[in-house]
Regions:
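Bacterial N-terminal signal peptides
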Residues: 6-17
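Alpha-helical cap/lid subdomain in secreted, periplasmic
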Residues: 101-262, 266, 271-288
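Conserved catalytic region of serine esterases and O-acyltransferases that act on ester linkages
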Residues: 23-35, 48, 246-320
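Structural motif
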Residues: 92-101
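Positively charged n-region of N-terminal signal peptides that target proteins for export
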Residues: 1-5
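Serine-esterase "nucleophile elbow" of acetyl-processing enzymes
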Residues: 23-89, 103-115, 131-141
Length: 320
C-alpha cells in the first residue's frame, strides 16, 4: 500500500521526531543545504566550450535550489564545459515546445553540445482544458494525432495565433527534441524520469519505491529506434532511496511525493552523474575529480554510511 501523505507542517513535525530518534541528542532535522551552483538562465555561455543543456520540469528546476539541475554544475569541470539548466517548472514534453521555450533553448545550441531531455511528470495530465493550456501528451510513441482546441491563445511559439492544436504522442515529442538537437549538430540524451516517494509492498513482502510512472518503456523504445542513449538515473536514485528506507526518504520529499528538498535535489543530481558514469557517457569526460557529496553530513543519512554520489569499488550500496 502507499504510505500516507500528510500536510507540510505535520510532515515537518514528524521529520523532527524521526531525526531525533535516529541520532540521539541531535536537536531536530539538520539536513544541510548542499553546495549550490544555481546558474541564472541568462548567464552568458562561453562560446569556446561545449554546453550541456538540461530540458525538463520542476524536478530539474524548482524555485531556488529544489531541482537537481541546480546541483549539477559542481560535479563538472566548468572550465571545460558549460552547464545550462533550461528546465521550467510545470512543463511537459508538449507544453515546453508549444509555449516557445524549446525554440529559445534550441537557439543557443551549437555543434558539439549535449541536450539532456527529461520529461514525463506532467505528460500524464489532461490534454484539453478550458482553464489553461493543456500539458498532457498522447499515450505511446506512434504518429497518431488528434485535433484539439487551444483554450488559452498563445502569443509566441509555434501555436501563436492558432485556435486548433495537433496533439501528438509522448514519443513523437521526444523524437522532435532529438531531431531538432541533431539538426544543430548536437547530441541528444534521454534521461529516465525522477522517482516519486510512493511505496508499495512487493512480492517479497517488503516496501519498494515506485520506479516507473508510465513513461520508462516509451523512453527506451524511442531511444532504441532513434539510436539515442537513455541514461537510467531513476534506477540509481530508487536504489539509494530503498537503501535509506521510507522514513528517511520522506525527509527528502517535504513538499509532496514528487518534489524534493535541496538535499534530495543534490542526491538526484548525484544519481544523474552516477548513471552517466555507468553508461560510459561522453559527458563523463567533463566531470571534476570526485569529492564527498554534501548530503553525507546529514545526521539522518550518517546512519547509512554507504550512500554515495559516485560508484565505488566493491559490492553493496556503494554501487548505487
Amino acid at each position: 500500500m502507499n504510505l500516507p501523505r500528510v500536510l507540510l507542517f505535520a510532515a515537518t513535525a514528524m521529520c523532527m521526531q524521526v531525526c531525533a530518534a535516529q541520532v540521539p541528542g541531535t536537536p531536530g532535522p539538520t539536513l544541510p543545504v548542499p553546495e549550490q551552483s544555481n546558474l541564472p538562465v541568462n548567464l552568458p555561455l562561453n562560446p569556446s566550450l561545449p554546453t550541456i543543456f538540461i530540458v525538463g520540469d520542476s524536478t530539474a528546476r524548482n524555485k531556488a535550489d529544489l531541482g537537481w539541475g541546480d546541483h549539477f554544475a559542481h560535479y563538472f569541470d566548468t572550465t571545460r564545459v558549460n552547464i545550462a539548466n533550461r528546465a521550467i517548472a510545470g512543463r511537459s514534453s508538449r507544453s515546453y515546445i508549444n509555449e516557445g521555450s524549446w525554440d529559445k533553448t534550441l537557439a543557443q545550441v551549437k555543434p558539439g553540445d549535449y541536450v539532456l531531455i527529461q520529461m514525463g511528470h506532467n505528460d500524464g495530465g489532461t490534454p484539453v482544458s478550458d482553464a489553461f493550456r493543456g500539458r498532457g501528451s498522447g499515450k505511446g510513441i506512434g504518429d497518431e494525432t488528434a485535433e484539439i482546441p487551444v483554450a488559452v491563445p498563445f502569443t509566441i511559439g509555434p501555436l501563436a495565433g492558432k485556435t486548433v492544436e495537433t496533439l501528438h504522442t509522448y514519443g513523437w515529442y521526444l523524437r522532435k527534441y532529438i531531431a531538432d538537437t541533431r539538426a544543430k549538430g548536437a547530441a541528444p540524451i534521454l534521461l529516465t524520469v525522477t522517482v516519486r516517494d510512493i511505496w508499495t509492498f512487493g512480492p517479497d513482502g517488503k516496501l519498494h519505491i515506485e520506479r516507473d510512472m508510465g513513461f520508462r518503456d516509451y523512453e527506451y523504445e524511442v531511444g532504441a529506434a532513434e539510436h539515442v542513449p537513455v541514461i537510467d538515473m531513476a534506477s540509481v536514485a530508487a536504489d539509494k532511496f530503498e537503501y535509506l528506507g521510507p522514513e528517511t526518504t520522506r525527509l527528502l520529499f517535504p513538499i509532496d511525493h514528487t518534489h524534493t528538498s535541496a538535499v534530495g535535489a543534490e542526491m538526484n543530481a548525484a544519481s544523474v552523474v552516477t548513471a552517466l558514469r555507468n553508461a560510459n557517457s561522453p559527458l563523463a569526460q567533463y566531470l571534476a575529480p570526485p569529492k564527498p557529496p554534501a548530503y553525507e553530513s546529514a545526521p539522518a543519512l550518517q546512519a547509512k554510511p554507504n550512500i554515495r554520489a559516485e560508484p565505488l569499488s566493491g559490492a553493496g550500496p556503494d554501487k548505487m
